Amino acid sequence: MYSRREFGRLALVGLPMTVALAQGAARVNSKVNGVRIGIQSYSFRSLSLDEAIKAMAGIGIGECELFSGHVEPRVGPPGGAPGARPQQGGAEMTPEMREAMREARRKQQEETRKWRLSVPLEHFKDVRKKFAAAGIRLQAYNLSFNDNFTDDEIDRGFQMAKALGVKLITASSTLSAAKRVAPFAEKYKITVAMHGHSNLTDPNQFAKPESFSAALAMSKYFAVNLDIGHFFAAGFDPIAYIEANHARITNLHIKDRKKENGPNTPWGQGDTPIKQVLQLLKQKSYKIPANIEYEYQGEDAVAEVGKCFQYIKDSLA
């Protein structure tokens, strides 16, 4: 579901999008002073795929890292699409509530697995056509391989990426899952970029530079999808990391967080060096897409993403 403000804003951008879909659209150019700017479609998690595409075109963003929740069926509550990230906040849960949630999640995972293994690949080709008609380049498919994936499910994920016409999968994965994914990346010759968060206590998670290094050593088809907000909140310097590893960074997630594992914030209110990272991309001419990822809580996703894009423009002026 989406808010009234989002609905109103989509109505404004919907007419030109309708015309574009009917006539074909010129490629949307969202480069800012030579820096490639895209979006993680998770930013529009409250919108359907068609609504998200309309929003991207209306804002003027021409590259998309496609969140799997936008193409897979929503078998859970709003915001709980397959592959969705857990939401923060809420009342303390009882043990019974936690067990009920675990059972619901198990059922959801099984339903999603059945769908992944049976859905015609034409579904993904149709998604590809929608982006092409809107003039938006599909940059990557965000499918987070985890330890619950079967081998058939992993293989199918690469088939989905091929049907979408992308050569990159981004994944919030684990080191143990990455070992199983590596042979499939080699088989399909599709790059898998590991996305990190800020969990420093679990060595199986991607958070520390050492975790990324371990994955990079597994396959030449493994790379890094660096989330500068999470990386900084975990206590690491994204600028130094990008300079040292830019050759194996496929794309960035741009967001603002407070230091010392602090919360997501509206851009400019946290501690993440967003402007400095963008300036680095510009000055070094790194061809690394900087993808907006709107993750803090706001009332209107479309308006907030527009603010994020303007922040980028101002930072690169």
Language model regions located:
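A generic structural signal for short
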Residues: Q40-S41, W115-R116, F145-N146, I169-T170, ...
